[in-house]
Amino acid sequence: VIANSNSEKDQNLKYIVRDNLINYMNTLCNNCKSKEETIEVVSNHISNFTDIANQTIKDNGFSYTANVEIGNFEFPTKTYGDISFPAGYYDALKVNLGSSSGQNWWCVLYPSLCFVDVTSGIVPDESKETLKDNLTDEEYKLISDRNDSTINFKFKLIELFSHNHILTAKN
């Protein structure tokens, strides 16, 4: 969902539209068992998503409209707790509000990572299991492994002096 602008009112509306669309999607796609099935169901109901978004906009006193489309869109890296999705192109339902020049909110349609606890960013175990079932072991490892490697900063000049036993200061 891409807000009309970054004004507080437009950003708040974005979340109201989001919540209404998620509620509809939850009932519509609750029993979907694959990404392909989810895309098919959403595609078949695209006009309903548009109607819900437009009605929400109108009910909240705004005069612009929503444009809703399904496609393959570019997304930034997104991390939910211990799951990270790399930046790239993903199949998604894209909702543009008004001029769509504001900040966006995005989620993964399948499995339903839209429904995570936004405050803690925790991915439910059920969604993790669905990911495991739909990804190869290598793909799942890529998104779920935490990179806990430590970064060590070094100064080459200090290493050179230390290695060659060169004193830099005397008492």
Report residues per predicted region:
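Amphipathic, coiled-coil-like alpha-helical scaffolding segments used for oligomerization/assembly
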Residues: 35-76
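Residues that form generic nucleotide/phosphate-binding pockets
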Residues: 28, 45, 56, 96, ...
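Early exported N-terminus immediately downstream of N-terminal targeting peptides
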Residues: 1-46
